[in-house]
Design a protein with these regions (language model features):
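Hydrophobic ligand-binding cavity/cleft-lining segments
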Residues: 1-44, 173-175
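Short, surface-exposed coil-to-beta transition loops
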Residues: 3-5, 59-63, 84-88
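Hydrophobic pocket/interface hotspot
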Residues: 16-21, 27, 49-51, 66, ...
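Short beta-strand micro-motifs enriched in acidic
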Residues: 40, 67-69, 90-96
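Short, hydrophobic/aromatic-rich segments at coil-to-beta transitions
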Residues: 42-50, 69-77
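Beta-strand/loop substructures that line and gate deep hydrophobic ligand-binding cavities in soluble
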Residues: 79-148, 156, 165-167
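Charge-rich (especially acidic), low-complexity segments
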Residues: 163-175
């Protein structure tokens, strides 16, 4: 099982941060490989999201489901099929960590665990003569880079401007 855990300080209160991470439909703004998100549900526990990805010569729809919500501290999800993966966003109040010119802050955690070797080879339309093992080898190192980009872009969206976001890496594949 591989795991990515990143955190950063967001210059907003936990409620504001939570409302942004809760809205999966905005995620294509944060991940260029994510083309579209469709929802079946009201955003609560049990809501299912189809996330349409395209990268290189591959297209894939990840079918996810919200498994837990403890607003404004936590939102958990899992993939329903094709690969063993689950994750969560955690938000902790961090007002004492706010810079002097910022009213308050929160620490945002992105935490995902996945087993790339559980991927269903029939779920992805692979180009001719390309093996699933090769695709896993190509995608695996990119997942961490994409997670960093998503968190940075999410912070810019929450705060309304781009800034140099310091990420703390708690765990990454190979660590």
């Amino acid at each position: 099982m591989d795991r990515i855990v990143l955190s950063t300080l967001v210059h907003r209160d936990p409620e504001t941060v939570f409302e942004t991470v809760r809205d999966f439909r905005t995620y294509p703004n944060y991940a260029p490989v994510l083309d579209a998100v469709s929802a079946d549900g009201d955003g609560g526990i049990g809501t299912r999201y189809d996330l349409d990805f395209s990268w290189w010569k591959l297209t894939y729809t990840a079918r996810s489901e919200v498994t837990a919500i403890d607003a404004p501290e936590r939102l958990a999800w899992r993939l329903r099929e094709d690969v063993d993966a689950a994750g969560e966003w955690r938000i902790e109040p961090a007002p004492d960590a706010a810079p002097p010119d910022v009213e308050t802050a929160s620490r945002l955690f992105f935490d995902v665990a996945y087993d790339p070797h559980t991927a269903d080879p029939n779920a992805i339309s692979l180009p001719r003569f390309v093996s699933l093992d090769r695709v896993i080898g190509l995608v695996r190192p990119r997942l961490y880079d994409e997670a960093e980009k998503v968190v940075r872009r999410l912070v810019a969206d929450i705060e309304g401007e781009t800034r140099d976001v310091e990420l703390t890496v708690h765990e990454q594949p190979g660590s």
